[in-house]
Amino acid sequence: MFFDHCQCKIAAPLYNQLCTNKTNVSTYAFCYYAGAYMAKIKIFSTAEQNSFESPPVFNSIERKRFFTLPLALTASIEKFKTPTNKVCFLVSAGYFKAKNRFFARQFHQVDIEFISKQIGINPDDVQPNKYNKETYRRHQKIILNYFGFSSFDTLAMVFAKTEVDLMVQVQFRTKLILLEIIQVLTRKKIALPNYNVLFTLITDMVNQY
């Protein structure tokens, strides 16, 4: 069969889109166009990707909901030394509560001001650019532990690859695969990684078929 000779191993539906008359398309031409298609796979639109990679934008009701944190968590800040560490920790916890992921030390100023007011800190004393990576990593562990989540580590990657592999066998629409693996990781209480990790995972698996 034609597909037995095509090293790019792409699904038949794409081939049918490229040409309605298979006898007029060479194996090499199909592989070239299929390869070009795979190289240009785009799952989320630019706007969707930016939204996924950015902290949530809350309205006033959502802000109260997600930044109303349990006493056991807010009490953790008593041992933190600086206003920046205290506020950034609580904002990070609120973002995680809403989205099950962290946002690489990105914070909306309105959220910093809201949390600062809650705990009696002057917002001007909060400097997110001085919230260092090591402190942020320690805070992530506290937040993950409180919410009962695990980080997206090597074991999580193996699990995600297995799940995506099963999805790719029955679903060729990459966006649906992405949305589903997000739900699977959330149900397993695994913190979501960034978009590029999921994008690479899915496209690598798709390219194997």
Enumerate the language-model features and the residues they cover.
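Cysteine-centered motifs
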Residues: 6-8, 19, 31
